[in-house]
Amino acid sequence: QRQMCIRDRVLEADQQLKEMGVERPTHVFVQAGVGSLAGAVVGYFAHKYKDNPPVMAVCEASAADCLYRSAVAKTGNLVNVTGDLQTIMAGLACGEGNTIGWDILKNHVDVFASCPDWMSAKATRIYANPLGDDPRVVSGESGSVPLGFCFTALHDEDAKDLKEALKLDENSVVLVISTEGDTDPVRYREIVWDGLYG
């Protein structure tokens, strides 16, 4: 049942790209808790564009960054994160990766990112206050982190190396996945209206 739900989300994202006239994203940014959704998204796009896959980035809460730590360890095995997994990205505060998802991710992800809370909060505010004709998106903290990581790579002077490593430029077609609304409306308002974690 869960795998069908994840598959349907990925197919929906692909359909939305087609409706917008996008044949192929150059970059895919997705959040991860245990890695099931990320594995499905990455696996789908790696298979669909196997001859020229998009650059794939997986974004985790730094307090629970088990996939990031697993990638850095370079053993091929999962590394668990224990202790206090305190983060505003409650949906990503897992600390233990899914073995099936990890098998896909370790072979197809270009960048694993350990993201602080401020990065997610900033993206929550960006989604809530779009520029021009862009639609407003109500995205909770767990859903916002891929945009936060992408925005940081593009606009933070200290992240120039990251921007280059991700091969982000004016021709990039970026897909960021958000799978969460304002699951905590009070916290959402504190972030968007009051600048919490700003």
Where are these predicted regions, by residue range?
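Active-site-adjacent helical/loop segments in soluble small-molecule enzymes
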Residues: 3, 97-166
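Glycine-rich phosphate/pyrophosphate-binding loop at beta-loop-alpha junctions
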Residues: 3, 7-107, 162-198
